[in-house]
Amino acid sequence: MKTKKPIVCVIIPAFNEAEAIGRVIKDIPEMVDEIVVVNNNSSDNTQEVAKDAGATVLYEKRRGYGYACLIGMAYFD
């Protein structure tokens, strides 16, 4: 019987994290299948930096960790 490889995904809520988000994404282990950054109404270029680093970027205009996490979880639902 073959066992399926588990799928590992990471959700990162982000608000004005342009200076750090690229490094955070690059430091995530290669075993992770998909990285989703939820841009939480940032006024900097968080979205562009995250996308350039290889993440899927979602947008949530309502500020707050909970809103961003819910959008990220809904993406995988």
Give, region by region, the residue ranges found by the protein language model.
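Structured catalytic core of nucleotide-sugar glycosyltransferases
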Residues: 1-77
